[in-house]
């Protein structure tokens, strides 16, 4: 694959993943405005975001093993088109809690299809020696989505109206849909390997680690703006602060992927260490101290939510012929955590405080780190004799 084709692959990957992630994080970031417009509680807002991830779980598990059969590019286009439909529904129709809920169910299903599919898309087009960076760039789609969502508060929601945030995301999705290739003309040998055995036990443990780590991170993505407002910042400033945190995660994901290509193994150990550092960031956020918000947010985002690319790279290296299947399983763990994390966070805020919610987030990150370490040991035991660098 030449440099131009590789660049197109990376751009399409991050644009596709960003499009199908935007509905959840737009809803979280715009919550401070939507809440007053539709008279919603914090618990209801958490439920909206969680429903998105709940809808993704069955599709990630069902589509993962069937991606090659159904067609990678075809599935990507279907997922993006479904997301655009959900965004336009929220933007153009008279929204209620129920209508937004239904729209986010459709968007969540599309995201469940997209994640294992775009993993296969990447590995089918990028050579092994560059896949760590490729996954880092692809996983940077999530902080890019939260960055755009954070900027949507001061630049869109507080100026021309919150619905225009969804409309802008829909336009981005339409451009992405057009950019997705109709056929795979850049396939690499890596993408066409014979299916390898999926080691289910270790993958389930690692999926649990994903659940706890991502549950904490997605709660942060959904509620950091609201938490910053509670700490005394204006909604506009709170949105900018969230965007700064998202930018740090964006950079970390790309750089961690870059270094993963230059490191022989131990990728899951790095993931566990990053989760532990992220827990410190959550604890600092629990202080609700305006002077610490920027540092705590950057630490929590960069470490607590910067590990996903390295994680997926490790899974693809240990399952070179069953990439979509294996990452579909671990992605389901991420969705489970993302389902429960924002909902629990919202309940804790409503019944206790933001401080308690951030402390629970820190505990979740620590549990996730422990699960990653245990899962790595189990995976290495199962794959003894195979030099695949977990």
State what each model feature region is.
Residues 69-80, 262-275:
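Cytoplasmic membrane-interface "Motif A"-like loop-to-helix N-cap segments
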Residues 59-71, 253-265:
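Helix-to-loop junctions at the C-terminal end of transmembrane segments
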Residues 82-95, 277-289:
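C-terminal ends and interior cores of transmembrane alpha-helices
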Residues 27-28, 202-243, 249-254:
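Extracytoplasmic gate region of multi-pass secondary transporters
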Residues 266-311:
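C-terminal transmembrane helical hairpin of 12-TM major facilitator-type secondary transporters
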Residues 321-354, 361:
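A late C-terminal transmembrane helix in Major Facilitator Superfamily
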Residues 99, 137-181:
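Helix-loop-helix hairpin linking two adjacent transmembrane segments in secondary transporters
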Residues 104-141:
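Cytoplasmic helix-loop-helix junction between adjacent transmembrane helices
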